[in-house]
């Protein structure tokens, strides 16, 4: 048996490490290879601390060497986990919460909730403590996307007072109106009733320590948006749009709402969802079904950051239906896109907190419009 190190390297170039877009060699995951007779020792470094990722790495390396080099090679895989550094986030905390990010869209149907769910899961994978408040009162979909639709939050006693304890999955703490309503019935509430329910979720819940609380807002601009901004000091807003002109017109209005002088919530950036269609069997083919770079051009026109583009692929829909955010499927184009989005959001939050004062909740009056509190 004559095993060559170069053949082992070539075999490992055909697989990827969990969470990396490049192959295992070019990404730097393979640290060392030792070949002695029929024995091959491979030292690998990964960033994903989960036991599943470590086991998968071992199996993939062995499979690659046995399949491409020699089926009877004695393979030893040493996997070391080095978790990525968590960037320092400086924000104004409210009980335990460092940064509150509102995710909005001027128009329904652009994938705002899907983007929010994957952004939350991506931030959790990066090592942040993340909460997600589903404020889309009339169409709460976050519980289904996290496979917790059948769960019911329990109460927890903190300093002698009872609080709602969020449901947790994939490292994300979740609260939604959907946990407290019948899934087969429509939520028919007037604005004040919906706002009251949200206030209970916000102030009668125990989130613990969080780096980020993401809020999945309803589409458009209205009572719920104002109630949230009255209740909480929003660190910044992320606006989701497709490249389509009709969606961009509504996204422009959404940005304008946050930029109103007496609301003045910093816009962290715009995300272009469904940027292009890519068949999973032809990942290099791009079809711009809804137009090309519309949200990117809108961001430039409005002088706000462009946070990235998310492709339209079948895997995103399937992952949402299965209750497992697609960003958790390491190595796929859509997972890489959401991971890049999370990195850009963190970058934008850090820059915002270094250059702007802490946010304050706003106060709405009937006679004076919106004024800072």
Residue ranges and their predicted role:
Residues 54, 59, 211-212, 218-318:
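Conserved catalytic-core segment of NTP-binding enzymes
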Residues 123, 128-184, 202:
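Phosphate-binding loop that captures ATP/GTP phosphates
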Residues 26-29, 36-38, 43-104, 349, ...:
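Extreme N-terminal, non-catalytic leader segments
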Residues 100-136, 263:
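Walker A/P-loop phosphate-binding motif and the immediately C-terminal alpha-helix
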Residues 322-332:
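C-terminal boundary of histidine-terminating zinc-finger modules
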Residues 344, 354-373:
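A short, charged, Gly/Pro-tolerant segment at domain boundaries
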Residues 153-156, 177-192, 201-225:
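Switch II (G3) loop of P-loop NTPases
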Residues 1-31, 63:
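N-proximal, solvent-exposed amphipathic alpha-helical segments enriched in charged/polar residues
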């Amino acid at each position: 048996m004559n095993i060559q190190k170069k053949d082992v390297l070539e075999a490992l170039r055909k697989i990827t490490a969990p969470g990396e877009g490049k192959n295992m060699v070019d990404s730097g995951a393979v640290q060392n290879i030792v070949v002695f007779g029929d024995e091959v020792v491979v030292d690998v470094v990964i960033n994903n601390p989960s036991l599943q990722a470590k086991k998968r790495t071992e199996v993939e390396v062995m499979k690659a060497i046995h399949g491409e080099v020699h089926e009877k090679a004695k393979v030893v895989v040493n996997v070391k986990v080095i978790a990525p550094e968590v960037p320092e986030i400086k924000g104004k905390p409210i009980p335990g919460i460092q940064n509150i990010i509102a995710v909005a869209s001027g128009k329904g149907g652009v994938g705002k909730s899907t983007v929010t769910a994957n952004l939350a899961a991506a931030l959790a994978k990066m090592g942040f403590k993340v909460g997600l408040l589903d404020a889309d009162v009339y169409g709460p979909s976050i519980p289904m996307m996290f496979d917790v639709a059948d769960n019911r939050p329990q109460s927890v006693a903190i300093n002698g007072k009872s609080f709602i304890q969020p449901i947790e999955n994939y490292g994300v703490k979740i609260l939604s109106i959907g946990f407290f309503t019948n899934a087969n019935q429509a939520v028919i509430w007037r604005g004040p009733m919906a706002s009251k329910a949200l206030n209970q979720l916000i102030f009668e819940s125990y989130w613990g320590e969080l780096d980020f609380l993401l809020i999945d807002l309803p589409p458009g601009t209205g009572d719920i948006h104002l109630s949230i901004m009255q209740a909480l000091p929003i660190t910044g807003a992320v606006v989701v749009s497709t490249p389509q002109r009709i969606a961009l017109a509504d996204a422009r209005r959404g940005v304008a709402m946050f930029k109103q002088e007496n609301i003045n919530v910093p816009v962290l950036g715009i995300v272009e969802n469904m940027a292009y269609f890519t068949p999973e069997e032809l990942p290099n083919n791009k079809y711009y079904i809804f137009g090309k770079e519309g949200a990117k051009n809108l961001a430039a026109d409005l002088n706000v950051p462009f946070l990235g583009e998310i492709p339209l692929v079948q895997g995103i829909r399937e992952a949402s239906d299965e209750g497992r955010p697609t960003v958790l499927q390491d190595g796929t184009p859509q997972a890489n896109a959401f991971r890049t989005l999370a990195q850009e959001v963190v970058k934008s939050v850090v820059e915002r907190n270094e250059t702007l004062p802490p946010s304050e909740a706003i106060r709405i009056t009937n006679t004076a419009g919106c004024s800072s509190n």
